[in-house]
Every structure is written in structure tokens, then in C-alpha cells.
Amino acid sequence: MRECISVHIGQAGIQVGNACWELYCLEHGIQPDGQVPGDKTAGHHDDAFSTFFSQTGAGKHVPRAIFVDLEPTVIDEVRTGTYRQLFHPEQLISGKEDAANNFARGHYTIGKEIVDLCLDRIRKLADNCTGLQGFLVFNAVGGGTGSGLGSLLLERLSVEYGKKSKLGFTVYPSPQVSTSVVEPYNSVLSTHSLLEHTDVSILLDNEAIYDICRRSLDIERPNYSNLNRLVSQVISSLTASLRFDGALNVDVNEFQTNLVPYPRIHFMLSSYAPVISSAKAFHEQLSVAEITSSAFEPASMMVKCDPRHGKYMACCLMYRGDVVPKDVNAAVATIKTKRTIQFVDWCPTGFKCGINYQAPTVVPGADLAKVQRAVCMISNSTSVVEVFSRINSKFDLMYAKRAFVHWYVGEGMEEGEFSEAREDLAALEKDYEEVAAEGGSDDGDEEEEY
């Protein structure tokens, strides 16, 4: 089987994780205590959920996941929440003191004490798999744990499971909304290792998702659980083809094959359609063509950047629900004729499509409407560079004065690491510029790293 292990790191990773596992359970008819009611199993394919859940002798389903945080409060919510019986207590790992928004604490001092325990738990999960396909890593790069411990774990996973693919779902700092002063430092230091140690990284940012909730779901003041439920739909759509059957199934390794033209250029935009409230859905018939074109709307992107400022290199459309290949081909043909959606000249085809017959599931009482069909788009666009240049310029403003640097050095980092990471990101910006440039002839940049 093609199992995936999910690793949720830090507050953002864990809270997105909660939303995801809640949704997976609903999709597979698994109750919060891990049992599947008897009558369900007859119709279900037994192996459908084994990519994400392992089964115990007693018929209980346990997520192949691990939750790590350096301080206990967020994980304690899982330990006492609705799904407390779903997870094995050993899968919930928490430390005593947090990383205090400091990459160096997460990566060197405090993270170092907990990382071996985490890897040990991951090893147990991996031994339980017959054909481990890869890891899904959830974290945010603005804080201390998600950035510091997140990159430490990724580095160690690369060493121990070198060939397995690693997909990152990474929350990046928003342009306007900031949760900490040192976000730019943490993000730059963390992206430095994301560049090396993830195969595909899907960028998210809270502000973009707030705007989607406000605009499309009419939520005046969205909170994190609104955001996370939207993100969980995207992640569920991506992994649906691992868990259900469909006309065109896409597995994790296919993402990187189809989306990553050069190893470093692996930061993706994501969007999801239709995002629509129950009040409106009743009155709208959303055709495949409509949801496809709304997935390409700049306003649908889950990270603040404008795809019209860049060019698409590749794009992956994952449909689910009542969709047939004929409609998909027609919708894609329409997209190709649009002038606003530009592809680089060296990648003329550029579309990877997946279809899954399982209709989207919604969490009862949540804001999203139940719809017949939905699409999730993951695209590799050169406009992602906006996200990095924004963070880089904020980093430069602070680093020019060496503001706050002593907190990092005091935790055993060297100042050289700052400039090294910053140079790496400058090189990344340059890479994106070159890829976007006309005439795709490169001077031997093509050695693959795999």
C-alpha cells in the first residue's frame, strides 16, 4: 500500500492537523473513537483508508500521524478534545517550555532534546507501513517551533528516509497581519532548510485565507477554525486519490514529477473552488468549467500573491465528485485560451489532472456548503517569488541593524547562519527570475538531485 505519515509541528501544524483528521474521519465514516460502525464496512473498500489509518486487532483505526509541540497547551487540547480516543497517546509529543518565537530555540536548544523521541515515534509508524510513500509535514515558518523544530525534523527525515518524498504544507507570514516581530528571521532561516529538504512545498498564508472566508463565505470575522477547515479541504482533495478510487488517480510522487521543473523551484500556490456558503449554494449550479475558472482567479489563491504577475510552469487540477474527463478537457481547453493565464514558453502542456469520484465531504455545522463537485488546484507559478521577496525585504530592514539577533546567538546560533540563509533566498529569487525569463535555454542547470 501507499501509506503516508503526517507530521504536525507547532501550533499551526497541530491545528491544521485537527481540521484534517476531523475531515478524514468523516470521509471514511470513522467515529471519533476510531471505530467504524458495522454496516458501513460492507460497502467500503477495506484498503481505502489504510494510506492514512492503521487498523488494530480490535478494529480500531489509528491515524498514521504524529503531533509535536515544544509546549503542552495546544496538544492538551487534542488530548482532551473530541478526537482524544482516536490518537495513540505516544503520537502526541509535547515538551515543557516553548520555543518563544525563536528559530534557534526550536532548532538547537529545546528542539534538540525532543527530536530523537519524535524520530523514534516516526520510526514506529514507518515500521507499521508496508510501502511507505512519503511524509506530509505541516508547520508554520513564522513561529519558533514550526520553523526551528520543523526544519530540524525535515533534515533528520532526509537522512533517515532519503528516498521518501516529503510534501510540506507551510503557513508563511502574511503581508499585513503579523503574529510576531521576528517572523522574517524565522521564515528566512526555515526556508533555507525547506529548500533542501522538501520535495514539494505548498504555501498558505492566513491573510489570503481570511479574505477568502470574508468574501466567499460571508464570515465577518473569520477565526482559525474557519481557516483550518478551508485548508483541510485542500489537503483532503490532494490526498483523496490516495484514499479513494477515481478515473485519474494521482499519487504523492506524481506531484513532484509534474510540478517541479528544477529541484529548488518547488514552492506551490494552492486554490480551491467552489468556496461557497450553504445559503448561496442552493441557488447555484456550479459546472466544471465554472469551478475551474474560479480556481484560477487571483482572489482564490491561498497565499497573497498575484499569479498575473508571473507565469505558470505547471499546474495540477484535482477534481472530486461528479466530474467526467470530457468536462475536464473542455475546461482546461478554455483556460488555455485565456490571455490572463500565461504559461512559460518552455512548458506548453502544463496541466496534470486528477479525477476522484468521492464527492467533497463537509464538516456538519461548518461554513462550507455541501457541493456535488469541487476542484483543488496546485500550481507552480513564478509569482510565488513575491512571497519570498516580501519576507526578504523585511529581514533586511531588521538585520541591517542586527535587531533581535542576540536572542538567536544566545541560543547557540552563529551570525553567519543568518547571512547564509539570506544569500540562499536571494539565489532563490534569482532562480525564479531566470525561469520566468523568455527563451528557456539554461547553462547546465539541469543536473537533477534525485
Swiss-Prot record:
Q: Which SUPFAM superfamilies match?
A: Tubulin C-terminal domain-like, Tubulin nucleotide-binding domain-like
> Per the record, where is site Involved in polymerization?
Y450
Output the Pfam families linked to this UniProt entry: Tubulin, Tubulin_C
Q: Which residues carry this modification: N6-acetyllysine?
A: K40
Q: Which residues bind Mg(2+)?
A: E71
InterPro entries from the entry?
Answer: Alpha_tubulin, Tub_FtsZ_C, Tubulin, Tubulin/FtsZ-like_C, Tubulin/FtsZ_2-layer-sand-dom, Tubulin/FtsZ_GTPase_sf, Tubulin_C, Tubulin_CS
Top-rank taxon: Eukaryota
Residues reported in the UniProt entry to bind GTP: Q11, E71, G144, T145, T179, N206, N228
Entry keywords, A to Z: Acetylation, Cytoplasm, Cytoskeleton, GTP-binding, Hydrolase, Magnesium, Metal-binding, Microtubule, Nucleotide-binding
Locate the active site.
E254
The prosthetic group or cofactor this protein requires is: Mg(2+)
- Which top EC class is named for this enzyme in its record? hydrolase
PTM text? Undergoes a tyrosination/detyrosination cycle, the cyclic removal and re-addition of a C-terminal tyrosine residue by the enzymes tubulin tyrosine carboxypeptidase (TTCP) and tubulin tyrosine ligase (TTL), respectively.
UniProt xrefs under CDD domains: alpha_tubulin
* GO CC annotations, alphabetized: cytoplasm; microtubule
Q: Which PANTHER family match?
A: TUBULIN (PTHR11588)
Q: What does this protein do?
A: Tubulin is the major constituent of microtubules, a cylinder consisting of laterally associated linear protofilaments composed of alpha- and beta-tubulin heterodimers. Microtubules grow by the addition of GTP-tubulin dimers to the microtubule end, where a stabilizing cap forms. Below the cap, tubulin dimers are in GDP-bound state, owing to GTPase activity of alpha-tubulin.
Q: What is this protein called?
A: Tubulin alpha-3 chain
In its UniProt entry, the species of origin is given as: Zea mays (Maize)
Give me the gene this protein comes from: TUBA3
